[in-house]
Amino acid sequence: MATQAATGEARATSASMRSGAELLRSLDDGRQVFLDGERVGKVVEHPAFREAARQIARLLDIAAAPELRERMTFVSPKTGAPVWRAWQIPRTHADLKAKRLFSEAWAEATFGLMGRTPDHVAGFFTGFAAVPRVFAAGGQQFADNVVRFYEECRDNHLYASYAIVPPQIDRSKPAHRQSDPALYAGVVKERDDGIVIAGAQQLATAAVFSDYLHLACIHPLQPGDENYANAVAVPINAPGLKLYPRRPFARERMSSLDYPLTSRFDEADCFCVFDDVFVPWERVFIYRNLEVSRDQWWKTPAHLYGNHQAQCRYATKLRFMMGLAKRMNEMTGNDANPAVAIQMGELAAFATIVDSMLQAHETTATVDADGILWPSQTTLYSVMALQSELNGRMLEIIRELAGAAMITLPSSARDFDDPTIAADIDRYMQSGKADARTRVATLRMVWDFLGTEFGSRHAQYEKFYGGASFLVKQNVNRFFDYKRATAMVDAALALPAVEPARHL
């Protein structure tokens, strides 16, 4: 396709690291993004996307920094050039730790507030490419396509997002029994040179900033749903692909002084519509195959690698949350209060559990017969199962610690521009440990983290991004070592009888 070729020309060659500036330039490629009743002209110039795009571009520059070369890259086995470590297939525990250090560097640069940075879907495709025989069950050409696409993304530092959940139209019915067969994204035509996709899919976070969209389905599909049992990669600027972001929280004239997080890190969750989108065969990984559509997630380490990155990001976010709570207590003078110390201890325990579980599913990872390292499924899914509950409790504690501090602040940063107003603020809103401007800035950030639309979206995101909690708990149940547990019960039941003690 001419569109695909044009997109590729804007990217870095495999002999060099892709820069943030190159990423930003590549976004001006005719992609169809619709917001507030009109098509967005240039993503990088629109106030809803501009700053988030710059934050992602900064991540590419971090990865390309010469002083971080060892931490952020490994040598491509195909080109010999440095490439993002996110694309490394881990074969040793040291490899998996190195991938964590890569993701932590990006997560720390965004304070854990951007969940779909380029390393996330990279984890999934790394897992797919690690076990291509799963895709070969539908035909060897599909396995070859997966590996080629993985190598292209790896060697050209490409950014893929994904849409893997069908729209919530009528979940009581399978895909093929919806009122219109083209509601869910599926195949509507097969051609000699590829297939045509029509329908909708969600939830493509950060798709507006990406090079490719991976369309697949992680929901269980039933017999009769074959037209929806596909996996493909589509350029974001492909004709017929339309992105509908939710209402952006970063808006025009929004001050970063008042909304320091919203203004920078709003990722843009997108609803995707495929209006007869053509996909050439070389970008098709699964075609009308229910079994492979299911197995791609569970018989490859893709789901584990992608969520390993997600837990790196989440553990980093919790450290940021702990820092916010600590600074807030300092600003309010409550840091030495014994009751506050108890609540902070509870927060610290939760943050430590997540970080410890992250390291545990690395150290308990196992190597399969092909030499591929698989993170511990039980450990990973256990922390994911706890996350929705722990995160809510942590936010509740910070709200309790804050009291009225977050809502007794000046109306905006412009209040400091008026000498009379500023004089009152400087006098009455100071802290015992900081001046008024520092106190207000700190508490504004806490409010942006907790109380704004941005904060509410994050609370919802952490609750559901890994799937509904009951599904995650089913995964824990599926992978728990019941054999070892029940063997102990059987051993206890088989203990020899003990003669009753005689009374003296």
Labelled PLM ranges:
Residues 165, 330, 356-363, 392-399, ...:
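Charged/polar positions within long, soluble alpha-helices
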Residues 1-76:
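Acidic/polar, glycine-rich intrinsically disordered N-terminal extensions of enzymes
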Residues 309-367:
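Extended amphipathic alpha-helical segments enriched in small hydrophobics
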Residues 74-212, 217-231, 237, 242:
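Glycine-rich flavin
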Residues 167-313, 477-504:
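FAD-binding core of flavoproteins
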Residues 50, 54, 151-154, 196, ...:
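Generic structural signal for well-ordered, non-transmembrane alpha-helical segments
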Residues 378-504:
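Alpha-helix capping/hinge segments and adjacent helical runs
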Residues 341-345, 373-381:
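Short, charged, amphipathic alpha-helical segments
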